[in-house]
Amino acid sequence: MAENTMWHETLHDQFGQYFAVDNVLYHEKTDHQDLIIFENAAFGRVMALDGVVQTTERDEFIYHEMMTHVPLLAHGHAKHVLIIGGGDGAMLREVTRHKNVETITMVEIDAGVVSFCRQYLPNHNAGSYDDPRFTLVIDDGVNFVNQTHQTFDVIISDCTDPIGPGESLFTSAFYEGCKRCLNPGGIFVAQNGVCFLQQDEALDSHRKLSHYFSDVGFYQAAIPTYYGGIMTFAWATDNDALRHLSSEIIQARFHAAGLKCRYYNSAIHAAAFALPQYLHDALSAQ
């Protein structure tokens, strides 16, 4: 791709977004997907897979803080964390900030993502790949959760959209495997797209997860990079109380963890579970 051109996202047929390409840093087709990182004056370094924006330096902190601190602080004493995907290292970066976590396992299907993100997205991983608690496994996520003998307190599915390599991470086989290796009272979370534009994705996840967990819901965050703005995250656990913890409890845990965030706080945590009526109506209609 030439520099000083426009890169157009291909996620939606009838509408979308574009980024000016100031400088292409990396572009390669791996065995699994088409990877590109380019620089944009407004959003910094932008990474896309198969024509879909995955992350930008400008706003990645919102996504990663919400996918890690919400389940970890709701759980309260997570020791073992599993990340599915997350090859850019930012999810790992946020989990490593929790000093009580003892092991962090990341399963990434594409070794190429990890290697080039270490070089081209250093602000994302911020040295977290060198944390002694971290183990990298190159494997298919569905295979791992159905075969591993390890168990986890929190599982974070940092999956791409349900197309291409990421499609298997939205299947019943994956959700069943996650339930299999989740400790009692554990929490599973996953990105579930922009619900206003991809509502079927959320409904499908809710329907499938409900077969394996007693408490299934969603929480949301405003992330400009993802077209439509309001990203939805799936939430699943067998401890019904964890979704309804008071902001005072979350604030106490947040303070004890010594965290300082740019987006996440205890009020955001509580408010994130307040969903728009159209989603409540759609879930009730299933």
UniProtKB/Swiss-Prot annotation:
Pfam families, sorted: Spermine_synt_N, Spermine_synth
A GO biological process held by the record: spermidine biosynthetic process
Cellular component annotations (GO), alphabetically ordered: cytosol
Compartments where located: Cytoplasm
Keywords of the record: Cytoplasm, Polyamine biosynthesis, Spermidine biosynthesis, Transferase
UniProt-recorded Gene Ontology molecular function terms: spermidine synthase activity
CDD domains found in the cross-reference section: AdoMet_MTases
Location, primary (coarse class): cytoplasm
Pathway connected to this protein: Amine and polyamine biosynthesis; spermidine biosynthesis; spermidine from putrescine: step 1/1
Role description: Catalyzes the irreversible transfer of a propylamine group from the amino donor S-adenosylmethioninamine (decarboxy-AdoMet) to putrescine (1,4-diaminobutane) to yield spermidine.
Subunit architecture: Homodimer or homotetramer.
PANTHER family on file: SPERMIDINE SYNTHASE, SPERMIDINE/SPERMINE SYNTHASE
Name assigned to this protein: Polyamine aminopropyltransferase
Native organism: Salmonella typhi
